[in-house]
Amino acid sequence: LFPENFSAQIRLADWYYIQGMLDESLITYEVAENLDSGNPVVQARLGRIYADKNQNKKAQAALEKAIKLNSKDAESHYQLGKLVSSEEKWGRAQSLLSNAIALDAKQAAFHYELGKVLLGRGNIELAQEKFKTALGLEPQNSNFIMGLALALVEKKNLDQALNILLPVSKKEAKNSEIFMAICNVYTKKGYFTAATGYCEKSLELKAGNYETMNRLAWLYAKKSSNLPKAFELSSQTLKAFPSRPEFIDTLSEILYVQGESDKAMAKIQEAINLVPNNPYYKQQLWKFKNVKPKPPA
């Protein structure tokens, strides 16, 4: 194979990419880029690989270039929109994803990603419409169903959210995310026993998921049950993410329930220091100071 054979480089790089050999694919695309840096296909694919390798700055630069070279490239608008959305730059993400849809409205994933952005911006009605559009194109896609459920939860339509999530959990009994989504809805309803069961199932399917571990520890604390396990889970999450206020809050709740109010107050103060304007954490501090915990069941 001669490196100067541009189309052969592209074919080889594509083959590596399809096989999941990202490093080899990247090297081959970089050779292709040296041969023709103004080729929009090369830039688009470099962007995709950098994104898959979590090299977001490089991915964004390549995708920006791809869009400049070919403004009709819907996929690059979508990929860049997704990356920008992950940084919560909602305005730019909305613009990019809207462009992607204008260029190719039949891609369900484009509508789904835009739905997530609209949800992030607090535009619940429009987000719900986008999730419905995505589901109209791919009715069985569980991610799209979870997206719609999130919008329903924001609208306080908790029973409707459960009605669409529960059937998926029967069909996709190994999908940890569905069980976690159901756990979150039951938590919102205040049905902590049901929520705990779904959260335990989710963690069983995907051990080591810190969000799930934190939620389960919090549920145990709320039920004043299984507190040693709650403390163990919470400690693990904080070891991995010592500055996550919601993880700090969980440990403070466990300490409070265990009757260690002074430690709980010191711990929740850490969360308040990180997000001084959060009213919930201030409310927690007041509770720890003024309300005696119920003795554990």
Regions found by a protein language model. Give the residues of each.
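Canonical positions in the second alpha-helix
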Residues: 1, 31-32, 65-66, 99-100, ...
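Structural marker of alpha-solenoid helical repeat scaffolds
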Residues: 1-2, 35, 69, 103, ...
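Helix-start (N-cap) detector for alpha-helical repeat units in TPR-like alpha-solenoids
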Residues: 6-7, 40-41, 74-75, 108-109, ...
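Residue-level recognition of tetratricopeptide repeat
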Residues: 14, 48, 82, 116, ...
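Register position in tetratricopeptide repeats
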Residues: 18-19, 52-53, 86-87, 120-121, ...
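Alpha-helical adaptor scaffolds
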Residues: 184, 210-241, 246, 253
